Amino acid sequence: MGPMKVLLVLLVVMVAAPHIADAWQQPSCSSICDYSCGKSACISYSGRCGCCASCRRGPIYG
């Protein structure tokens, strides 16, 4: 493999890793919403948590 292909593989792994880790851990909804609701991070959990889904309707970033 050439150096460009190696870099491409590394990039894909780095982008995918957080999503894989998140799906694996499935943190509890209450802790996510306590710390993330009202922040942009909340949106990534909107499908999983009812409280973050309600936060999603009127997100306050920051």
From Swiss-Prot:
Biological process according to GO: defense response to Gram-positive bacterium; killing of cells of another organism
SS bonds (residue pairs): C29-C55, C33-C51, C37-C49, C42-C52
Keyword Signal included in the entry's annotation: yes
Keywords: Amidation, Antibiotic, Antimicrobial, Disulfide bond, Signal
Signal peptide: 1-23
Entry keyword annotation includes RNA-binding: no
Tree of life domain: Eukaryota
Post-translational modification note: The amidated form is probably the active form.
Residues with Tyrosine amide modification: Y61
Biological role: Has weak antibacterial activity, mainly against marine Gram-positive bacteria like C.maltaromaticum (MIC=200 uM), C.mobile (MIC=100 uM), C.divergens (MIC=200 uM) and C.funditum (MIC=200 uM) but also against C.glutamicum (MIC=50 uM). Has very little or no activity against Gram-negative bacteria.
Similarity section: Belongs to the paralithocin family.
Stated name of the protein: Paralithocin 1
